[in-house]
Swiss-Prot record:
SMART domains: DEXDc. Residues 257-281 are annotated as: Disordered. InterPro entries: DEAD/DEAH_box_helicase_dom, Helicase_ATP-bd, P-loop_NTPase, Y'_ATP-dependent_helicase. It comes from the Eukaryota. PANTHER family: PTHR31583, PTHR31583:SF2. Gene3D superfamilies: P-loop containing nucleotide triphosphate hydrolases (3.40.50.300). This is Uncharacterized protein YHR218W. It comes from Saccharomyces cerevisiae (strain ATCC 204508 / S288c). GO terms for molecular function: ATP binding; nucleic acid binding. SUPFAM superfamilies: P-loop containing nucleoside triphosphate hydrolases.
Amino acid sequence: MDRKRSFEKIVVSVMVGKNVQKFLTFVEDEPDFQGGPIPSKYLIPKKINLMVYTLFQVHTLKFNRKDYDTLSLFYLNRGYYNELSFRVLERCYEIASARPNDSSTMRTFTDFVSGTPIVRSLQKSTIRKYGYNLAPYMFLLLHVDELSIFSAYQASLPGEKKVDTERLKRDLCPRKPTEIKYFSQICNDMMNKKDRLGDVLATAQRIRRRYNKNGSSEPRLKTLDGLTSERWIQWLGLESDYHCSFSSTRNAEDVVAGEAASSDHDQKISRVTRKRPREPKSTNDILVAGRKLFGSSFEFRDLHQLRLCHEIYMADTPSVAVQAPPGYGKTELFHLPLIALASKGDVKYVSFLFVPYTVLLANCMIRLGRRGCLNVAPVRNFIEEGCDGVTDLYVGIYDDLASTNFTDRIAAWENIVECTFRTNNVKLGYLIVDEFHNFETEVYRQSQFGGITNLDFDAFEKAIFLSGTAPEAVADAALQRIGLTGLAKKSMDINELKRSEDLSRGLSSYPTRMFNLIKEKSEVPLGHVHKIWKKVESQPEEALKLLLALFEIEPESKAIVVASTTNEVEELACSWRKYFRVVWIHGKLGCCRKGVSHKGVCH
C-alpha cells in the first residue's frame, strides 16, 4: 500500500468500519511526513484526541505515526485497562488495610490509596470511580517507552532506573493476585522524587489528604483529575498551548513534600473552571410545554398538580417523592418539566427514567415520545454507546439502574461529556424512578437492587420518586435501601408547598421531601370503578366463576388476575388454559421471557 495511505489503514482497522467517517478528520490526500511529527492541522482520530484532551487538557499533540498505533490500543482494550486499574486499587486497599506499617512501600500505599478516614469506604464506593479515571494513566505508564512524547523522560534516567514495562505488565498479571512489588517500588520512587513522573502521584496523594482534612464538598474525581492534568501540562511544557490563569503566590498545602526550591515552581497552574450556564426558568415554561403536548386547550387537573409540577421544575429541592392515586397524572409531573428543559437552547439536559418491569418499557417510551416533544431512547443505548448528544430521556428498568456499567458511565460523566462534545453544557438532568416502593416491598428482588447504592446520585440535578402505594414507612425504607438518607422527618402536604432555598449539600446527603396526594378522609380514588371484597373458601374457584361469567357477557373483554405467589401464577395459568387464552408472568422470569409474554398480552 502507498505510504501516504498506510496510517489511514491503521486508523480504519481501529475505528470499526461503520464509524470511520464519523471519527476521522484527515484530508483525503495526506502528505507523507516520513515518520516525523504530524502538524496540528492533521488532527488525530476523535477517540484518541479525547484521551489526549482528558489527560493533558490540550486538543492536539504532535505524535509520530507509531504513537497513533500505540494510543489506539487503549480504545481497543479499554475494558482491560479499566479492570486492571480496579484490581490495582483493590490490592492497594488490601495492603493498606492489612499491613499499614509493614514497610515504607506499604505506608506509601496507605497514604496514596486510602487516607485513613475513608479506608473502609474505598473498596465499596470509590474503587470503581477512581479506577475508571486511573485507566488512561495506567495505560501511559505501561507504554511509557513506546511514545515519543515520553522520550525525554526515559532518556533522562540511568539505564537501571528506566521503567521496565514488560516486568511491570508481568507484575500486574492476574495470575499474581498479591505480588505488586515492582509497581509498588515505582510508586515509592515517584513519591520520593526519584523521577519527574512522581509529580502525578504526589499530587494525587496531596489532594486526597486535603479532601479528607477539609471535608470539601467538591467531587473528588474532578479535583483529582484536574490537578493531575495540570502536572502533566507542566511536565510536558505545554502551558502555552493551554490558557491558564496564574498566581504568583503559593499556598503551603500546594507544596509537595520534598520538592526542591526552584524558580520554575514559583507559579501555580490553575485549571480554568467554567460554571455551567443555566437559563432562567419560569412557570410559563410549563404552560408552553403543556400546550406542545396536549394542544392549546391544555389545563392542569387541579391546583395541586399545577403547584407540584412547578415545585419539580422550579425549586432547588434535590430529591422529591410523590404518592398519588392511579390515573391522577403522575407522569405529567415530570413529563412537562422534561419538555421545558428540552426547550433550553444553551444547555442540553439528559435525564433517565426507570420502571420496575420490562413489560412497561415499550408503552412508556411511546407515551413520553409522542408529538416529538422529547427524543427518547432505551438506557441500553446509553450503557453500550454513551451519550449521543441527541437523546433527552433514556428509559430503562431497575436492572439497568443497578448495573455496574451504568454507574460507571455516570461516575465519569463530567470528563467524558466535556471531551466528547467540547463543552460542559451537556448536563445530567432528572433521575426518575417509577413505583419506587418496589425497592422495599419486592423482597425476592432486593439482591438485584444492591448495585444502586454505588450510583453517584449527586451527579443529577434532581431525583424524582413516584408511587401510587408508598405510605411514609415504605417510602422511607425504600429510599434508604438504595443508599439515600430517606424521607424528611415531616412529609409535606401539598398545601404547605414553599419555594426551597438553595442547597449546598449533595442529593444523597439530603432527606427526600414527600408530597402525599392521597388523603385518608378524601373520596376513594377511581370511585367510578366497582369494587367487591369477598371472603370465600376457595379463591381460585371463585375467581374462575367470575371470569366465566364475565366472558359469557363480554366475550372480547380482557381480565387481569393477581396471585399471591409465583407458584400459584403458573398453576392457575396451566389449569385455566382450557377455558381462556392465558398469558402469565412473574418477577422471577428473565427479560426475554417477559418480552415474549408482553407481546402476547398486546396481541
